[in-house]
């Protein structure tokens, strides 16, 4: 493990990303990063800007000790611009993505106990989308995901505005897509957040942020109280810090416009968005802004906390919640080509 470089605090800033680890194995963008039993599983991604073929390696990062190791596992797939989700507390399912020659809608699963990759089969009733990349997969329950968005040409505009439910069965090693009746604005490089609705009997809604010329989130699913059993990680201290941060800001009705390839993590009633690439500028397109979407009241409010530290600019990165801390992993920096080898945690000065 190489030494950790200190970025420091930008003058007047109320927050920063503080480096806690550094390893060349972590340097990648457009990868997936999934927490399982206190370890982060990084799958695939691009190792440098302009790379045509994605990585096929899997790296495990242990945040408790700050160490990363490459997992040697048979059948590791070439993937970037994919998404991943856990099934059965054991199988890390990688959904879709770019393999260097085409977009896929197939499912590859890492059996984390046997450390072997498996190619799962489609059920006979499978109705898959066109190949997926820069899409999102959101867990609704163990073995059920909501899939939205994808990259593609204009002739497939309607289809990549479609929403799919993806059922995953680890017992039979199979999957099945079902197209939902609703559609959204076509988008890619967006993020998705399953958030509680305001009120005395909160249900849930799935919101899509960014990935198109839009300033507000779009609803990709709504569920009445008690329908969603998926439990978010408990992060009481981080939630308190976010509440204090937004209390110091000015709430807005509109969020960031035309943002893509940013990160998003749900912390209680807050969606925490960071970085990404803006489509509103021809130059200096990679961002280092922190946005908080606060759903505690109706209507929800946006809070924007910019940074003057250009070293924090990221695109194609991931954030991951563990042990009451929000971690930033990978991504390309300001030049859009150099992958960051650092792991950072979100730190506040309030």
Swiss-Prot record:
Which Pfam families has this protein been placed in? Kelch_KLHDC2_KLHL20_DRC7 (PF24681)
Q: Which residues form the signal peptide?
A: none
Disulfide bridge partners, by residue number:
none
Query: Any keyword Repeat?
Result: yes
- Which key words tag this protein in UniProt? Kelch repeat, Repeat
Highest taxon of source: Eukaryota
UniProt key word Iron-sulfur: no
The molecular function GO annotations come to: cyclin binding
- The residues bearing each Kelch repeat, given as ranges, are 39-89, 91-137, 325-350
Q: How does it assemble?
A: Interacts with CCNA1.
Under which name does UniProt file this protein? Answer: Kelch domain-containing protein 9
């Amino acid at each position: 493990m190489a030494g950790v470089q200190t970025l420091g605090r930008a003058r007047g800033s109320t927050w920063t990303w503080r480096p806690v680890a550094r390893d060349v194995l972590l340097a990648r963008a457009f990868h997936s990063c999934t927490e399982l039993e206190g370890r982060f599983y990084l799958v695939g991604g691009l190792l440098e800007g302009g790379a045509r073929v994605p990585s096929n390696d899997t790296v495990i990062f242990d945040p408790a000790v700050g160490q990363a190791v490459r997992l040697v596992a048979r059948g590791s797939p070439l993937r970037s611009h994919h998404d991943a989700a856990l099934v059965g507390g054991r199988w890390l399912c990688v959904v879709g993505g770019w393999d260097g020659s085409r977009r896929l809608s197939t499912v590859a699963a890492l059996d984390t106990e046997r450390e072997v990759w498996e190619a799962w089969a489609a059920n006979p009733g499978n109705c898959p989308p066109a190949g997926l990349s820069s899409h999102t997969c959101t867990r609704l329950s163990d073995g059920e995901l909501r899939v939205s968005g994808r990259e593609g040409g204009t002739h497939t505009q309607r289809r990549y505005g479609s929403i799919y439910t993806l059922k995953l069965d680890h017992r039979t090693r199979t999957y099945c897509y079902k197209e939902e009746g609703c559609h959204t604005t076509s988008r890619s490089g967006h993020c998705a957040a399953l958030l509680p609705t305001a009120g005395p009997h909160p249900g849930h809604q799935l919101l899509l942020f960014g990935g198109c010329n839009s300033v507000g989130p779009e609803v990709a699913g709504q569920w009445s109280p008690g329908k969603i059993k998926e439990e978010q990680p408990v992060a009481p201290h981080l939630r308190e810090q976010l509440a204090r941060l937004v209390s110091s800001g000015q709430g807005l009705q509109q969020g960031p416009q035309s943002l893509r390839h940013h990160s998003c993590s749900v912390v209680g009633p807050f969606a925490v968005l960071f970085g990404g690439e803006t489509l509103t500028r021809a130059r200096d397109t990679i961002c280092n802004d922190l946005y908080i979407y606060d759903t505690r009241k109706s209507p929800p409010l946006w809070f924007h906390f910019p940074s003057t530290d250009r070293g924090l600019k990221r695109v194609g990165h991931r954030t991951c919640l563990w042990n009451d801390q929000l971690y930033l992993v990978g991504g390309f920096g300001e030049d859009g080509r150099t992958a960051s080898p650092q792991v950072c945690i979100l730190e506040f000065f309030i």
